[in-house]
């Protein structure tokens, strides 16, 4: 056990510590799911897994609440695996190492997994508790949310018995989410041709130290995208420096996180100091430009092993130009929902694989037409760059409903717990609620949770005091669910 088990509420933190001890990155959450299933069987709860691996647990109502409206608490089982450069952490084998840092819980050198591990822990703590009042209760734990919402998409029909769903994936205390953006993946592939490397020198340009973050929730903050900044650097170098050729370009590691690092390996003739000086000058400009948003930004040149082949001159320029004009970030703010992004995209991963440079992009929008406007932009660019773009794994947004029983009850108890009215809002991030609503169109839904910062990055942290507030809210709401 780690030191976080000394925190309150103790049952929730005990469960989160256990969750951290069992590796559960996306696509590797079966061990955690099976652990929970076996625990539920030992407690003699109804427990079942569906065809895609989702877990459903049922607990009878406490005495006197048997005829109250049944509720399902929902969380996802997987976490985003991100580690600091040089950290050998294997997310499929190594436990997360949480620790207390003042008012926050963090992890040592990796993502913490408080998204959605705290929510998951809260559902299990409710199940284990013997002194909480609640109606007939279900807990739904979904698979592989972070890389495509596979569990929510494949959820068994007519499985849930509840009429109210509380999603636990919100990352701001004092807020109730009632709607979210939909999304679609885009794979953008630029074909490249190679030639024998006859250049004298090779070097790697590396960009690192960016903050990264959630590609939906943080897309409006002005944080730099490492892939886009690197493309800008290469475009500037190609204008002013002697001819060079790329042999590799890469950046980012996961589609739904803003890339923190990127690098390009290039070959060139002439004085090495010419490239070094040019990059140093660009670094000065960029550091000044990004001083507030990215205080730890670094850009540097280092020697690299000579590759046997390099991109042709035409392929080098095509890759640089296509990446430099590839849209990224906020496309449009919502006219309907104040201070919320309507449509965006984030270039999440860049790889050189054989004869293509491949970019993985996540498009988000509150409205379907906005989502497909962005995909049309990418299709047009693909034509201009002689590239190929394919779209996959679309998921719907969650359309807000401003009047529901669960919203009224949650507002009431949030005001009591906080001493002020909560903020009811729609977010520019993907929650599973839109997909769950397709399976169960008549179910009422809200989403709540504690304050989490820098999700999807190794700087992720959860605010300790807000976990207690979230727990107080959740338990009060469950005790006040009305009769049918």
Curated annotation (Swiss-Prot):
GO terms for biological process: proteolysis. Binds 2 Zn(2+) ions per subunit. Can also use Co(2+). Coiled coil: none annotated. Its EC number is 3.4.13.18. GO terms for molecular function: metal ion binding; metallodipeptidase activity. Pfam families: M20_dimer, Peptidase_M20. It comes from the Bacteria. The keyword Kinase does not apply. Belongs to the peptidase M20C family. This is Cytosol non-specific dipeptidase. The keyword Cytoplasm does not apply. InterPro entries: Peptidase_M20, Peptidase_M20_dimer, Peptidase_M20C. It catalyses: Hydrolysis of dipeptides, preferentially hydrophobic dipeptides including prolyl amino acids. Zn(2+) 2 binds at residues 76, 115, 169. Keywords: Cobalt, Dipeptidase, Hydrolase, Metal-binding, Metalloprotease, Protease, Zinc. Zn(2+) 1 binds at residues 115, 146, 456. Dipeptidase with broad substrate specificity. Disulfide bonds: none annotated. CDD domains: M20_pepD (cd03890). Its cofactor is Zn(2+); Co(2+). The gene is pepD. It comes from Haemophilus influenzae (strain ATCC 51907 / DSM 11121 / KW20 / Rd). GO terms for cellular component: cytosol. The active site is at residues 78, 145.
